Amino acid sequence: MSNERERLEDLQRIAKFRLLDDDFMTKCFEKHPKCVELVLRVIMGDNSITLKDEYSQTQYLIKNLQGRDVRFDIHAVDMDRSEYDLEIQRSKRGAGAHRARYNSSLMDANQIDSGDYGENLSDTYVIFITEYDVLNKGKAIYKIERYIDGENLFHDGAHIIYVNGSFVDDESAIGRLMHDFRCSNPDNMYYQILADRARFFKKTEEGEQIMCKMMEDMRNTAAQKAAINKELANIKALMETMKMSAEQAMKALKVPASEFKKYMAML
């Protein structure tokens, strides 16, 4: 495929992008905390929310020394020290209750210093904006809290929120926000700050160049992953059919010694 044809196809894809596409949302919100602030204010129903030091970070890596690291779509902290993990999920699989619990636990763990027993934990909010109504109750927003015997709030400060991206009500703030997340044309969006960011990446030369570079990087990453998976499959095949150890299989396949550790961790 020629570079020009590839570029034109990329531009066609960019024109169809919505904020519900997490890669596009990441670009729109990257280094633009006012967009994050708006979304949080609408979802939380609190126009006083202000991000601390105008801090928000996209694709925020949170470490887990005991298990798998997690990359949050958007991480933010407000002036009250409340911490937010904002996730875009188009599939039900990625928005399960256990994932919400896991993300919540990682935020707690990363707040605690050595010797701290959690007395100073800030409130945390794991927020999933889902393309469909994954909880199937027809509501715009679902707030999940812990209760004492099903009656009184436990007030542990850990909150999980699901936002139904398919909710339609252009008379309400949340309905207009979800309209904008579904909308591919910035000219039809309600919230000016979101429309301006989407318009920059869709309808200016500089923004289009940034998006085309992002898509090129995504293709390169996908190709690298495919090559790694193919090599891994070959290693496993030799181990199974030839009864080789992992190291023997990698040597037979002429895998660079510097990559042994990487593949060993994937077996």
Indicate where each model-derived feature is located.
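Accessory alpha/beta interaction modules
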Residues: 1-157, 169-171
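Short, charged alpha-helical interaction segments and adjacent helix-coil junctions
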Residues: 2-15, 77-79, 84-89, 173-267
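Generic amphipathic alpha-helical segments used as scaffolds and interaction surfaces in large
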Residues: 27-31, 164-168, 181, 185, ...
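Pocket-edge structural micro-motifs
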Residues: 128-131, 164-165, 202
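Low-complexity, glycine/alanine/valine/leucine- and proline-rich hydrophobic stretches
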Residues: 147-156, 161-164, 177, 181-184
